[in-house]
Amino acid sequence: MHIIEESYLQTFSHSLTPHITTLRTALETAYINGATASSLAYRPQFVSNNHKEGKKVLSSVEDELLACDQFQISVAFITMSGITPLLQTLKELEKKNIPGEILTTNYLNFSEPRALKKLNELQNITLKMYDVEAAKEGFHTKGYIFKKEEIYRIIIGSSNITSAALTYNREWNTKIVSTEDGEMAREIVQEFDSLWNSKYALDFDTFYESYREKYKIIKHQRDVAKLDDITSIEKYKLEPNSMQVGFIKNLRKIQEAGERKALLISATGTGKTYASAFAMRELGFQRVLFLVHRNQIAKQAKKSFRKVFSGQVSMGLVTGKYQEYDKDFIFATIQTLSKEENLHRYEKNTFDAIVIDEAHHSAANSYKKVLDYFEPKLWLGMTATPDKRDDNLEGRNIYEIFNHQIAYEIRLQDAMEEDLLCPFHYFGITDLDIIADAGKSSEEKVENFRYLTSEERVENVMKQAEYFGYSGDRVKGLIFCSRIDEAKELSKKFNAKGWRTLVLSGSDSEEARAAAIERLAGEESEDALDYIISVDIFSEGVDVPEINQVIMLRPTESPIVFIQQLGRGLRKAENKEYVVVLDFIGNYRNNFMIPIALSGDRSYNKDNIRRYVTEGGRVIPGASTIHFDEISRKRIFQAIDNANFSDIKLIRENYRNLKNKLGHIPALADFDKYGEMDVLRIFDNNSLGSYYKFLVKYEKEYTIRLSEDEEKVIEFISKKLASGKRIHELELLKRTLQYHHGIIGRLQKHLSEKYHCEMDEHCTENVINMMTNEFSTSAAKKTYAQCVFLKKEQDDYGISDVYGKMLENPEFCAILEELVDFGISRYKVNYSYHYQDTNLVLYQKYTYEDACRLLNWERNEVPLNIGGYKYDKKTKTFPIFINYDKQDNISDTTKYEDHFVAENRLIAISKSGRSMDSEDVQNFLNATKRGIDVQLFVRKNKDDKISKEFYYLGRVIATGNAKQFVMPNTDKTAVEIEWELETPVREDIYQYIVNE
């Protein structure tokens, strides 16, 4: 099919004029003056891969596909790893019937037939192959042409449709934007049409079978060539990776310091077992005991050690089935070894080193028995989940067992950065409307079971699994369910429809499990398995590197369990480029845990979590990708909105994890240092208000007690100042710990010398009001009546009598100083890069109260009095606060809503009852002339009851385009004003705000 009509002789129509004006400005930004504000959508751009900056060629291609009316692609190479992350987007285009033409080539016979077949199966796509052998010419094009109405956007450069090219390789591409009459776009489209209509461009049915056969022969030859040097391949495999090298180095230091215990915390699939084997070899241990909790894991560990030691030491198994006690290296199950008769076969000091695999089990009694008996030179614990335990007893934790000596810690995100794991393509897919069983009646559970195992659900799972596919010659998948009866019924129905599945549970024998895994991991045969279905036994420990598809059919219990189950597919293996993860997302209240698990962000900041759902694919390291379909995305947003991240249970759990890791009560700075929950969640909790109050209520070891007034002062600083959004008050408090008089003068001098920051009269007045409880609204003034830090002294201020009395208490001073230092640290990291001459930082988030304070208002204003904006005459500042919550029918209602036109253009509506002559409207329109400073604050979700924060987007200037109108369904007028942002909104923030 030919989808793009020639229109080269057309003249510009009147409808094109707005596009032309916008395009001209964008071209000026790109080619003449980068400081010119223009629309990113019309701007030529350099397109490359850099996940740390939120940039991937893949994201650019996806964005254009989702926005276009039609597309054409010409690339030399297409692989499954390249099209898999695009499959969800391509499916959406098929539903919308967006036509596409894709031209590839048989150049070097590199394109994968399976990928070509997958593309051709999409009803909206026509695929052709350019035969370079017949044409007797090379073919190395890499171009992506997207058309929307009269505008072309074309990405052209170095990127084929392969995983490496689209996600992490150093790639150089240019995105050009042109009208359909532009010379460059016209030439590119003509070139594509010429190739597409050439006699050498073969239809799919013409080329596919012969190309597939030829590809198969050549691939076999390549595979044989790879096997020519087996020795060098094995040697390469046995070189320690970056994690293992770092771990051995640190372990040596721990030993040299005289410590006898150490813990390795490492993400599933990063090679913990090999790390321990390399460590035993490098540190020269002669007798080693390797403890596991399953026979199968003991066998796998022995196999890994055998590769590292190559027969230099004898190795044996001590399990229910094997009794090979007298070997140098023993691989034993805890169940067998902890029996008295087996334990006492060995002397206490028989082993130089004892390694405990899945060490989060070591708090159990069976392990305690072994830990109490043996006296090796080194105890080494290994786990991916140190915070997961077999008991809930206070004080019995893994960190404590290993003396809080962490030899190395590498979590999922770190492991992906280091390329230690197999890339994954995660797809969040809408499941049926199933409600979790927890708290349901038996009748409701029966009804739920019918849904879980319904024909509709079975067919949907099979359809999605087939569409999204796998890497390799055949599927080798794991399916996680929430119930054993569900697993059995699903297996029965899957098998009836042609899948080969088997259910494994805790009741199955080791032999049955081993046999099932062999059938799954092996090559195609009569008794091969496509999937093993499980509830929990594959969450940890079992190593099946060949797994190339993971299907999750259960609610996310916790980020820990999610990562464990995801991790089953993340081990690297021969002929496995990536693993496909299909997560069927129902209406579960814990859905918010999915982005927390994938991002590794444990701050529990709602807006950060929302942004990861929409933008995570841009920032995830390496070739991995993340996609959610529209409904599953909404379900996660709903779960985030409903969650209370300042809930005391969540706070206590995160606190306990950090305390366990450290072995003592954490300092405030430890929460940031170890990436635990943002301590501001503690301050936000209304029953707490401060870390001090939390410790008093929930930490038995904490014995400090302050007076009620002292406690209130600590709460005030925690809630109002400790976030570090401004340095002034924090450094003022720091001065009061040293000086009692001349506080403001000393503060001004210190800020000028250390921060190059000057305090004008408005700022000085605001800081004084803040520290004398005069800034607060009446309700807050009453709550914090004791929080008066300063008193007037001639031409300066000294500390107040009440506060001075508090400073006589050394315990109060210590808590105050820690809190102030924490706030200063936060300021330096997050809030020190001010926008122009303000106290604000672009793209940081601020509440109404923050804005009033940082704009140096004399008094705070309650949000109700501010509404969408408020003018402060004294400072001549005029902040605008916008709740950006786009509706589904946006095209019909934009003229009555605040909305972005481009990254540097905003349409905002005045308050109702306003006309062109209203004072606030005139102040907006004449702001520059009147010396009024208009600042823009925008928030995505006004229903977030916890943060209530707005992104700060800088200064705005009214363009002069304004019109008065009557608001729908009322007799009141309002004024629509167009604003220009001095700084166009950063791409990732803009996309997050404007997209649903």
Can you name each region flagged by the protein language model?
Residues K214-P240, E466-Y467, S471-G472, A597-L730, ...:
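Long, largely alpha-helical accessory region at the distal end of helicase-like NTP-driven motors
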Residues E256-M280, R294:
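Walker A/P-loop
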Residues K299, L317, Y322-Q323, N342, ...:
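Conserved helicase ATPase core of P-loop NTP-dependent helicases/translocases
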Residues H361-H425:
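Post-DEXD/H (motif II) to motif III coupling segment of the RecA-like Helicase ATP-binding lobe
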Residues P559-Q564, R568-L598:
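Conserved segment of the helicase C-terminal RecA-like domain
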Residues V713-I717, R726-L732, N839-E949:
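Acidic, glycine-rich low-complexity segments with interspersed aromatic residues
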